[in-house]
Amino acid sequence: MQSSLARPLRPPVLAGCGGRRGHGAPRGSVSVARCRAEAAPPTVGTASRAPAGPYTGRDPEVKKPAWLRQRAAQGDKYARLRESIGELKLNTVCVEAQCPNIGECWNGGGGAGGEGDGIATATIMVLGDTCTRGCRFCAVKTSNKPPPPDPLEPLNTALAVASWGVDYVVLTSVDRDDLPDGGSSHFAQTVRALKELKPGILVECLTSDFRGDLEAVSSLANSGLDVYAHNIETVRSLQRIVRDPRAGYDQSLAVLKHAKDCREGMITKSSIMLGLGETDEEVKQAMIDLRAIGVDILTLGQYLQPTERHLTVREYVTPEKFQFWKEYGESVGFRYVASGPLVRSSYRAGELFVQNLVRNNKTGSSSS
């Protein structure tokens, strides 16, 4: 079975060169998660957006469907969380990457304009708000020489998250190719600070590939985190079109495999965007490749184009097709699959099933 996703990528009618990702979490959890940001770097020392190039612009034949239209973010929880994050000078991928779920997540699952009954979900990036890569799908700003990391950020982030009284948190970061270890030690310090302030908290880290440095992967994987997440983003054939040249399909698989091997009971997770021109068979193969290295959790969502300078949307995948991918993912062995048009990497990251999955894995590995 193959959908119109099989249409080959072509230079669009309009000239020009995608941000994405986080979603609602249940009561007692917060997703502090990440949008992967990676592409050819701009001029040294300047902060900018992804460069224009082929495969960009708007495709007049592809119209945004009604199921993707959302109200502008509002609501008391949204306003309070935005104020709190601003006062704490924390960077959120919700804002930086123009996430479509910001209203729903920050209102605790109640939709863009109303409040839900869960804990508001925010997406916090450590290591600053400027990425050293510039993938064509991502709206996060880029620079070859971003400001140095704030040495107080690990403690300040831990203090902020601990004050929110949550029991599950997702941390993420921009890529930092300018740092010797890609920022792994800074990331690990944040995890350890969180665990010290609140020993029972479950921590998910959505990481870069650290340029394939497996020692950096080990450092973070052994920092005390509970879920190691790293996104392959798209199918093998589209990697060089979608991601920065320094990223790669096999490199990402190697990172996930090494993280899995670092500690017994480690939960690993990845994410795939749809609507970029991939075929059904390519999506199936990507799922099989992820399962072959033991990845436990998979999220699939629609790629949304932030500006005309980002990758063109080739298809808006229907909710019914996303349901098909959820069922297919479960059939090949993923322990949890979140699949839908607005699903992002941290979608329902801390929901009860995932929390139980992590805790059961801990119990099983400690008793074996």
From Swiss-Prot:
Protein name (Swiss-Prot/TrEMBL): Lipoyl synthase, chloroplastic
Question: Which family does the record assign?
Answer: Belongs to the radical SAM superfamily. Lipoyl synthase family.
Which keywords fit this entry according to its UniProt record?
4Fe-4S, Chloroplast, Iron, Iron-sulfur, Metal-binding, Plastid, S-adenosyl-L-methionine, Transferase
Region ranges (Disordered): 1-30, 42-61
What GO terms fall under cellular component here?
Answer: chloroplast; mitochondrion
Coding gene? Answer: LIP1P
HAMAP family assigned: Lipoyl_synth, Lipoyl_synth_plantC
Question: What does the cofactor section's free text say about binding?
Answer: Binds 2 [4Fe-4S] clusters per subunit. One cluster is coordinated with 3 cysteines and an exchangeable S-adenosyl-L-methionine.
Sites where the protein binds [4Fe-4S] cluster 2 = 131, 135, 138
